[in-house]
């Protein structure tokens, strides 16, 4: 961990603890029309099953607000009690006041200081939401976005900057505006009576270097629990890499208590992809373990056969499918390391270093595949059923090592 690591307040969101010494929490957000209860429930269940520990939903109109209690009831029928966060912009004060059951059903409210109200109405409407949060004992995320920054605050800071002998750059003013908006709003919430351990803050931008710079400054200036994420990461590889780089750097420095990866899904792609990326970031940083890791080689001229790629895919899919039940039956199985290697160069070594590994024959090598368990050669596989036999060996290893003694 880096020198920025700060001890933050601990915030309870439903049954999930964020901040302090607690593990970094994975969040996600639905993209359904919230008033469509059936579709929204289906997507929340999918996100939660994929590993999302908190799910945010849009509450943008009266139909959505009225649907929230029903969504929570339907989720409970599936034994799903994942905390739901209501995402409010512009009219949150009205919706929470008019639909008190919605206010009770949500586990947290998200407020954007840039659009909670304008002019003289801003403080009044912000205060209305905070008072409702206090009355219902709910935490609040004060989420600032560069794309919807409080323009009055920005104008004020620009005027103050212009009067300085050595004015800041426009980029520095941007950073200052984001942080000032979040911290002034949090301070006002505390003045209204909301406890510090009910406040999470975020300052989101869409560029990697900007996000890193803003959160490094923010972490030095406060001890609120911090929500990390690019406000718009983008689609596909670009979005995944941008999120992994920015969040990875900050998390390694000890900055951030909960994360969301805001991917633009490809057409027909599952919404759960953003959850998978969050979990991969945390697991590859060594901060959390969710599912057994699979080490596999990229392939080269020695591995002319595509079989090792097919076996790697089968093993990974099998582990992902099984983890839903394994995590309840076999304590610690999520930390298991599996290796699927394609030739003799690194195959035996990587397989020995894993809990269980297989070294497949490369081009011109003897058509046998040694299997290593806990560093020792345990089996030699050959023939047309290597995939099935290796997966069976993995299954037996899990039962023997992680089963109740």
UniProtKB/Swiss-Prot annotation:
Species assigned in the record: Francisella tularensis subsp. mediasiatica (strain FSC147)
Q: Which gene encodes it?
A: ispG
Q: What is this protein called?
A: 4-hydroxy-3-methylbut-2-en-1-yl diphosphate synthase (flavodoxin)
Q: Which InterPro entries match?
A: Dihydropteroate_synth-like_sf (IPR011005), IspG_bac (IPR016425), IspG_bac-typ (IPR004588), NO2/SO3_Rdtase_4Fe4S_sf (IPR045854)
Q: Which Pfam families match?
A: GcpE
Q: PANTHER family under this entry?
A: 4-HYDROXY-3-METHYLBUT-2-EN-1-YL DIPHOSPHATE SYNTHASE (PTHR30454), 4-HYDROXY-3-METHYLBUT-2-EN-1-YL DIPHOSPHATE SYNTHASE (FERREDOXIN), CHLOROPLASTIC (PTHR30454:SF0)
Function, as annotated, reads: Converts 2C-methyl-D-erythritol 2,4-cyclodiphosphate (ME-2,4cPP) into 1-hydroxy-2-methyl-2-(E)-butenyl 4-diphosphate.
Family, per entry = Belongs to the IspG family.
Q: Which reaction does it catalyse?
A: (2E)-4-hydroxy-3-methylbut-2-enyl diphosphate + oxidized [flavodoxin] + H2O + 2 H(+) = 2-C-methyl-D-erythritol 2,4-cyclic diphosphate + reduced [flavodoxin]
State the pathway, as annotated in the record.
Isoprenoid biosynthesis; isopentenyl diphosphate biosynthesis via DXP pathway; isopentenyl diphosphate from 1-deoxy-D-xylulose 5-phosphate: step 5/6
Q: Which cofactor does it need?
A: [4Fe-4S] cluster
């Amino acid at each position: 961990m880096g020198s920025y690591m700060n001890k933050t307040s601990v915030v309870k969101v439903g049954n999930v603890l964020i901040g302090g010494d607690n593990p970094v929490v994975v969040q996600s957000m639905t993209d359904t029309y919230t008033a469509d209860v059936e579709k929204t429930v289906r997507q929340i269940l999918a996100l939660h099953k994929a590993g999302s520990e908190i799910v945010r939903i849009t509450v943008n109109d009266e139909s959505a607000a009225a649907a929230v209690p029903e969504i929570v009831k339907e989720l409970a029928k599936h034994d799903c009690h994942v905390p739901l966060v209501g995402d409010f912009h512009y009219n949150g004060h009205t919706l929470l006041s008019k639909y008190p059951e919605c206010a009770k059903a949500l586990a947290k409210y998200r407020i954007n200081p840039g659009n909670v109200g304008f002019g003289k109405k801003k403080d009044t409407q912000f205060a209305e939401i905070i008072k409702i949060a206090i009355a219902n004992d709910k935490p609040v995320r004060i989420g600032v976005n560069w794309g919807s920054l409080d323009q009055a605050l920005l104008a004020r800071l620009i005027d103050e900057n212009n009067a300085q002998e050595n004015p800041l750059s426009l980029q520095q003013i941007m950073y200052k505006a984001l942080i000032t908006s979040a911290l002034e709003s949090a301070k006002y919430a505390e003045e209204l009576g909301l406890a510090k351990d009910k406040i999470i803050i975020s300052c989101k931008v869409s560029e990697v270097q900007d996000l890193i710079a803003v959160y490094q400054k923010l972490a030095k200036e406060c001890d609120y629990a911090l929500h990390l994420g690019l406000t718009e990461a983008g689609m596909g590889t670009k979005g995944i890499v941008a999120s992994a780089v920015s969040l990875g750097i900050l998390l390694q420095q000890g900055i951030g208590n909960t994360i969301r990866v805001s991917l633009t899904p490809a057409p027909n792609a599952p919404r759960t992809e953003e959850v998978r990326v969050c979990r991969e970031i945390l697991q590859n940083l060594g901060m959390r373990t969710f599912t057994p890791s699979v080490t596999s080689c990229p392939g080269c001229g020695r591995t002319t056969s595509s079989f090792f790629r097919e076996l790697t895919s089968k093993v990974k899919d099998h582990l992902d499918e099984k983890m839903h039940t394994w995590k309840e039956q076999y304590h610690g199985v999520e930390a298991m390391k599996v290796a699927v290697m394609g030739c003799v160069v690194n195959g035996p070594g990587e397989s020995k270093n894993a809990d269980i590994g297989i070294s497949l024959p490369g081009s011109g090598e003897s058509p046998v595949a040694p299997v290593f368990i806990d560093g020792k050669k345990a089996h030699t596989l050959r023939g047309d059923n290597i995939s099935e036999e290796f997966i069976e060996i993995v299954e037996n290893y899990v039962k023997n090592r992680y089963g109740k003694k």
